[in-house]
UniProtKB/Swiss-Prot annotation:
Organism: Neurospora crassa (strain ATCC 24698 / 74-OR23-1A / CBS 708.71 / DSM 1257 / FGSC 987)
This protein's UniProt keywords: Glycoprotein, Membrane, Sugar transport, Transmembrane, Transmembrane helix, Transport
Compartments, record wording: Membrane
GO cellular component: membrane
TM region(s), chain numbering: 14-34, 74-94, 104-124, 126-146, 160-180, 194-214, 294-314, 319-339, 346-366, 379-403, 416-436, 455-475
GO process terms (BP): carbohydrate transport
Membrane topology recorded in Swiss-Prot or TrEMBL: Multi-pass membrane protein
Extracellular-side positions: 35-73, 125, 181-193, 315-318, 367-378, 437-454
Compositionally skewed regions (Low complexity) per UniProt: 524-576
GO MF assignments: carbohydrate:proton symporter activity
Name of this protein: Probable glucose transporter rco-3
Region of interest called Disordered, as start-end residue ranges on this chain: 512-594
CDD domains registered for this protein in UniProt: MFS_HXT
Family from the record: Belongs to the major facilitator superfamily. Sugar transporter (TC 2.A.1.1) family.
Amino acid sequence: MAIFAMGWQKPDNVAGSSAPAIMVGLFVATGGLLLGYDTGTINGILAMKSFKDHFSTGYIDGNGQPGIYPKESALIVAMLSAGTAIGALLAAPLGDHYGRRRSLIGAIGIFVIGAILQVCAYNIDLLVAGRTVAGVGIGIVSVLVPLYQSEMAPKWIRGTLVCTYQLSITMGLLAAAVVNILTYKLKTAAAYRVPIGLQLTWACVLALGLTVLPETPRYLIKRGDKNAAALSLSRLRRLDITHPALVEELAEIEANHQYEMALGPDSYKDILFGEPHLGRRTFTGCCLQMLQQLTGVNFIMYYGTTFFNNAGVGNPFKISLIMQVINTASTIPGLFVVESWGRRRLLMVGAIGMAICQLLIAAFATASGSNNLSAQNKVLITFVAIYIFFFAASWGPVVWVVTSEIYPLKVRAKSMSITTASNWFLNFGIAYGTPYMQTNSAASDESSIDLGSKVFFVWGAFCIVAVGFVWCMVYETSKISLEQIDEMYERVDHAWHSRRFEPSWSFQEMRDLGFSDGGIPPTQQLQQQPQQPQQQQQQHHQQQQHQLQVDLQQSQSRTSNSSTSQTDTGGSNNTGASQDDKLVASLGNIDLSY
């Protein structure tokens, strides 16, 4: 498979096969294509002459040609972000009630409705409505895809797998840039309707594919369906349900969930203002998502073609295509080092690199003024390209990785919903405000300022802030399980000490000793417990295996009553097949064979 060819190898001490989980995670990651493609198409469409001719409401640009008012272009771009913010907030109740997989299918259905409205739009109002509806679907996808990936992925490749969501976003941006180049010279409505309509193709493929994928084991444990969780995990790891490694992983997931439930019911108030470590995690996730936007990347992604055109750069469509190629290719190095370097180091290096590039662009533009525009454009293109490299290799994918890992199971969907919504709310502000930062007020008859390349002073300053924030607040979550991340937040007081964290107890041990009041792990008591001899550990595994077998047999016996009338000659084998089919059906009528 391609992912192994790129250099990732399963550790020798990991039982079974990770191939099914990797293939599932890679397919689900392509949900990012919807976001990337939609973002990329609007970047080029706003600069298309045919689009401006069809949708202009009387505005004349500096060249005396029909154009779009800044407030109108701001609405067209920003209302997608408004919709995504709404969708992100809806993702938690939907994902917890209907499951991650079914909610993703529903989200794609919403996106399809929005895309159809955009294709059929004949005025700005209908176009804005379509982008808002499509945004709701994308917002749900942006929460549930990383959540789905993190909950089903093996820990040794979890970060890399979640990074592929960002890779899919960049591939969508690149595809949109290619399509825009192929259609922008058309003089009919096909110039912009073809790029918009093409996104329906992959949306339908993704929705159909999701119907045959498994629900995540952690969600099934949260729902109380241990038998379905065992079967789902066995198919994702290619292990028998009684294999010690699978039993251990499933038991730890279940014990962790029982520990969280022992703390009492959760609410949005508890997530924000409850336990200190939970509030810290929420604050970390929200700030990371907001800082990702404040790096200024969507200034380039939304308005790059228009910005390069206003700066006097020749052939801005080709320059935007080059930037998207760099964006896509530069995401791949991040996949390689997200596990070996770790999340903290990669985020800090990326922020430092972006800050240097942006401040150099702004400083050179300020020093040169209106002189030597050719040299300014060369500096602009060069350092924007390097800046995109640093973003794509670090803050692009890694923010999604961290925010999908740091929350406990019982509030994971709610917390990711809040943090992702914070990303989209700020995305809306940037998308809406940018036209006013790049338009001459005399030409537009609106209150605006023409910062030009000096806007990079703003983005560069926030990148410097990002370096300090990562050092102080972001814990290192690589190479440990989602359940061990909970232990780390309980025990490690400062983020800069997190790289030295070593798990010392499990939630199974805590359950055996009894959860203490307030949910604080009985660390001292655990440390005082003598290590279990190998014979006792084996006996413990055998007991867990036996209990799983009993549970599954009971489940099978309840669902196989209708098969008892089969003949003695073939009844045994047929009943076994029937039982397995019905147990698979308990996962939601999905095919788990790989």
